[in-house]
Amino acid sequence: MKVYCLLLVFLVGLVSQAHGRLDKRCMTVCTMEYWPVCGSDGKTYPNKCHLTSTACTSQKDITVLHVGKC
């Protein structure tokens, strides 16, 4: 029983650590410059940085369709 508890604690720690790395990789500080881009999800983003940040944090493949509003 102790072995299972230790294994569970280890696995929870491992998953938490992996989740923390994902969040850090996605943290992006974007400027407030307004150079709108249209994303492949049909949304207009203030600039490419905001689109990239959203794609990373949502874990979706969002690309720039064109420069300007959708």
UniProtKB/Swiss-Prot annotation:
CDD domains: KAZAL_FS (cd00104). Keywords: Disulfide bond, Ion channel impairing toxin, Neurotoxin, Protease inhibitor, Secreted, Serine protease inhibitor, Signal, Toxin. GO terms for cellular component: extracellular region. GO terms for biological process: cell differentiation. The record marks 32-33 as: Reactive bond. Its main location: secreted. Acts as a neurotoxin by inhibiting an ion channel. May also act as a serine protease inhibitor, since it possess the kazal serine protease inhibitor signature. This is Turripeptide Gli9.1. It comes from Gemmula lisajoni (Gem-turris).
